[in-house]
């Protein structure tokens, strides 16, 4: 045994070792040398404290080489931090880092306004988590801060890096002079933009005045002009809001001020997240302005100086669209609606009906490029029907949806679950199911899709009595007339909407207020969402009421004046009776949901009868497809024989009972499509 092996190191000896070459060049180490001669108190001085913080000895203990990834460390000097541009050339995904992490600092210029997601994955071997005897875990910690032009102009901008610089005074003077110069430029730009906006408003006002003069020849024209003026002046005032931070004149980005929604959705501009070993997390943020800056500081937490294998990325999740763009004319033509019932695996029947209808439509028009979804102004769904609606909103082809559907539904309802196991093991495999929704639906937000109006139903069990909650891609300017105004939100990613609408109690725990907050999304009042089938297994009537509300008309007037076609597809499913009666201070459990849901379930056929009565005077308007003899099949069945039974029963139904109705509907949709495109 060598002398070195015989030597016993004590705490003070460890910190009296000579510095390595790297440490001599390190400003942090030089600062520690200043304190190395300070008086010792309780066997510990300032020098030992600082050196313990850096944990370089443990690095040398576990590995002969310094395991810090020096290439990925950014300088403390803000001028030396590389500015990353994102997105670039329609590349909406960027892998920022994948490897052994100690500490990385990034400054990213977000070139587009819209929603973003930060993804962090900790691939550390969990065996190291026992180093603290189970009291804590080695984690990846990420601090982020979104800095917009508004923050900079207001003088609120500060760099996240809090490390000391060698020449603090000179740096402060430099920053101060640069700040004064920047403020002067910003003031000039702001004045220029304000003057420009005033000039544009004067021009627009002059044009409106000239329109009044030209249309002043007759009383009838004057009346028409008066109506036009009242309508468009309000619309113009809302649209042409001055934005002191951009050169464009658009809607105010704070859309909550321009609608009647009671629920608000906000995002943090700075926060901190920690990811344990073998876990991954998403955090979402909303950038209102082009060319904002996102600062990231990613480092290990409670790792004793060891590096952690991880990766993290940045995703662009779509632009926020104001839907409808013109709230006074939400529909440019008579409205066609597609409504899809819930029903688990029974929605195989729904897809067969949709595919058959699309085939007939293409035959009528004579083109294989036409999509069925192009013929509808609103698409909605509940539970599994909601998943299909979201897939169509994402513009996935019907055939592709059909191909992936059995495996998707199987994963959502995976396992032999019953009411007992559902109550006591709620949330079983919820992370795996969330991964399925992420893979199938993606991270883009509902409001980033504007091809047609879309909503999926959910049930809010945070408040009693439980109530219907809609996840939409649009907002309402008006309240309903002589009807209920349904609550809802539109600033959520598609996968979260899918999780909410398909969270059938005893199968899948729905997203609670805490789950949503962990994603960086703050919804007020708080919500806890589960399967929409508890309130509306058939959303056809809800769709009619939503369209009437968008048009600012009562339901009867909308049906008489604006409705063209309503297509409702059922699943033959009679909902199983579960077992309702303020706000709950905690998330409702599966047991509470079951106990309080005896009278919540609405049968799909009851809704069908009510819609039929309301549309009795409208010929060739309402089309309902609901395959018989499949309602007794369990919605979570994994039996291939049940799949075959559903397929055969649906094919027989379409080619026997509904053969001519399919052709009649396809002919009507084809004529509507041709008129809207070419006439």
Swiss-Prot record:
<keyword id="KW-0442">Lipid degradation</keyword>
<dbReference type="GO" id="GO:0005737">
    <property type="term" value="C:cytoplasm"/>
</dbReference>
<feature type="short sequence motif" description="DGA/G">
    <location>
        <begin position="531"/>
        <end position="533"/>
    </location>
</feature>
<feature type="active site" description="Nucleophile">
    <location>
        <position position="383"/>
    </location>
</feature>
<dbReference type="InterPro" id="IPR002641">
    <property type="entry name" value="PNPLA_dom"/>
</dbReference>
<feature type="region of interest" description="Disordered">
    <location>
        <begin position="19"/>
        <end position="45"/>
    </location>
</feature>
<comment type="similarity">
    <text>Belongs to the patatin family.</text>
</comment>
<feature type="compositionally biased region" description="Polar residues">
    <location>
        <begin position="35"/>
        <end position="45"/>
    </location>
</feature>
<dbReference type="GO" id="GO:0006631">
    <property type="term" value="P:fatty acid metabolic process"/>
</dbReference>
<dbReference type="GO" id="GO:0004623">
    <property type="term" value="F:phospholipase A2 activity"/>
</dbReference>
<keyword id="KW-0963">Cytoplasm</keyword>
<dbReference type="Pfam" id="PF01734">
    <property type="entry name" value="Patatin"/>
</dbReference>
<dbReference type="InterPro" id="IPR016035">
    <property type="entry name" value="Acyl_Trfase/lysoPLipase"/>
</dbReference>
<feature type="short sequence motif" description="GXSXG">
    <location>
        <begin position="381"/>
        <end position="385"/>
    </location>
</feature>
<dbReference type="GO" id="GO:0034638">
    <property type="term" value="P:phosphatidylcholine catabolic process"/>
</dbReference>
<feature type="compositionally biased region" description="Polar residues">
    <location>
        <begin position="162"/>
        <end position="176"/>
    </location>
</feature>
<keyword id="KW-0443">Lipid metabolism</keyword>
<keyword id="KW-0378">Hydrolase</keyword>
<feature type="active site" description="Proton acceptor">
    <location>
        <position position="531"/>
    </location>
</feature>
<feature type="region of interest" description="Disordered">
    <location>
        <begin position="155"/>
        <end position="194"/>
    </location>
</feature>
<comment type="function">
    <text>Hydrolyzes the ester bond of the fatty acyl group attached at the sn-2 position of phospholipids such as phosphatidylcholine. Involved in gametogenesis; however, it is not clear whether it is involved in gametocytes development in host erythrocytes or in gametocyte activation in the mosquito midgut. Involved in gametocyte development in host erythrocytes; however, not involved in gametocytes activation including male gamete exflagellation.</text>
</comment>
<feature type="compositionally biased region" description="Basic and acidic residues">
    <location>
        <begin position="177"/>
        <end position="188"/>
    </location>
</feature>
<dbReference type="GO" id="GO:0016020">
    <property type="term" value="C:membrane"/>
</dbReference>
<feature type="domain" description="PNPLA">
    <location>
        <begin position="338"/>
        <end position="544"/>
    </location>
</feature>
<protein>
    <recommendedName>
        <fullName>Patatin-like phospholipase 1</fullName>
        <ecNumber>3.1.1.4</ecNumber>
    </recommendedName>
</protein>
<dbReference type="GO" id="GO:0007276">
    <property type="term" value="P:gamete generation"/>
</dbReference>
């Amino acid at each position: 045994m060598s002398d070195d092996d015989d030597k016993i190191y004590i705490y003070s000896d460890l910190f009296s070792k000579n510095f390595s070459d790297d440490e001599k060049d390190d400003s942090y180490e030089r600062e520690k040398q200043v304190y190395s001669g300070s008086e010792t108190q309780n066997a510990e001085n300032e020098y030992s404290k600082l050196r313990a913080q850096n944990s370089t000895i443990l690095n040398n203990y576990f590995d002969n080489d310094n395991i810090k990834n020096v290439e990925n460390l950014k300088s403390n000097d803000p001028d030396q931090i590389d500015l990353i541009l994102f997105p670039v050339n329609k590349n909406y995904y960027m892998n920022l880092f994948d490897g052994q992490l100690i500490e990385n600092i990034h400054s990213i210029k977000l070139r587009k306004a819209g929603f973003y997601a930060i993804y962090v994955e900790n691939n550390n071997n969990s065996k190291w988590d026992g180093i603290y005897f189970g009291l804590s875990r080695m984690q990846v910690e990420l601090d982020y801060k979104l800095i917009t032009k508004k923050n900079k102009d207001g003088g609120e901008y500060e760099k996240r890096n809090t490390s000391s610089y060698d020449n603090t005074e000179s740096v402060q003077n430099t920053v101060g002079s640069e700040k004064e110069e920047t403020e002067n430029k910003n003031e000039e730009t702001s004045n220029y933009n304000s003057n420009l906006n005033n000039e544009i408003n004067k021009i627009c006002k002059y044009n409106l005045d000239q329109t009044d003069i030209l249309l002043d020849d007759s009383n009838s024209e004057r009346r028409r002009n008066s109506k036009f003026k009242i309508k468009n002046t309000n619309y113009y005032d809302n649209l042409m809001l001055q934005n002191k931070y951009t050169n464009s004149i658009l809607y105010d980005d704070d859309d909550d001020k321009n609608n009647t929604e009671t629920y608000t959705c906000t995002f943090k501009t700075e926060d901190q997240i920690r990811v344990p070993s073998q876990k991954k997390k998403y955090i979402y943020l909303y950038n209102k302005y082009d060319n904002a800056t996102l600062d990231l500081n990613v480092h290990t937490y409670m790792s004793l100086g060891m590096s952690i294998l991880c990766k993290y990325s940045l995703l662009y999740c779509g632009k926020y669209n104001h839907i409808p763009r013109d709230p006074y004319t939400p529909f440019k033509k008579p409205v066609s609606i597609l409504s899809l019932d819930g029903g688990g695996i029974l929605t195989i029947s729904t897809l067969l009906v949709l595919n058959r209808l699309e085939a007939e439509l293409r035959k009528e028009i004579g083109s294989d490029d036409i999509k069925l979804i192009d013929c509808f102004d609103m698409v909605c769904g509940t539970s599994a029907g909601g998943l299909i609606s979201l897939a169509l909103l994402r513009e996935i082809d019907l055939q592709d949806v059909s191909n992936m559907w059995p495996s998707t539904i199987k994963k959502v309802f995976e396992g032999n679950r019953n009411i007992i196991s559902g109550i006591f093991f709620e949330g079983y495999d919820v992370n795996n199911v969330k991964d399925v929704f992420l893979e199938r639906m993606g991270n883009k937000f509902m409001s980033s899709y504007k091809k047609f109006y879309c909503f999926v139903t959910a049930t809010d069990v945070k408040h009693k009595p439980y109530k219907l909650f809609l996840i939409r891609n649009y907002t309402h300017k008006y309240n309903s007339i002589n009807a209920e105004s349904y609550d809802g939100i539109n600033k959520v990613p598609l996968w979260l909407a899918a999780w909410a609408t398909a969270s059938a109690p005893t199968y899948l725990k729905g997203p609670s207020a805490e789950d949503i907050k962990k994603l960086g999304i703050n919804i007020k009042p708080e919500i806890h969402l589960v399967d929409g089938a508890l309130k509306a297994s058939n959303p056809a009537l809800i769709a009619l009421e939503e369209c009437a509300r968008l048009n600012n008309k009562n339901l009867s007037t909308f049906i008489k004046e604006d409705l063209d076609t309503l297509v409702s597809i059922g699943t033959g499913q009679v909902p199983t009776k579960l077992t309702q009666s303020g706000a709950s201070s905690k998330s409702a459990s599966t047991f509470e949901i079951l106990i309080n849901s005896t009278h919540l379930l609405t049968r799909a056929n009851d809704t069908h009868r009510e819609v039929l009565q309301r549309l009795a005077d409208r010929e060739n308007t309402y089309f309902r497809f609901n395959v018989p003899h499949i309602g007794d099949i369990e919605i979570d069945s994994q039996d291939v024989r049940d799949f075959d039974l559903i397929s055969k029963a649906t094919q027989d139904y379409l080619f026997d009972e509904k053969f001519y109705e399919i052709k009649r509907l396809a002919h009507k949709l084809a004529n509507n499509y041709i008129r809207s495109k070419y006439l």
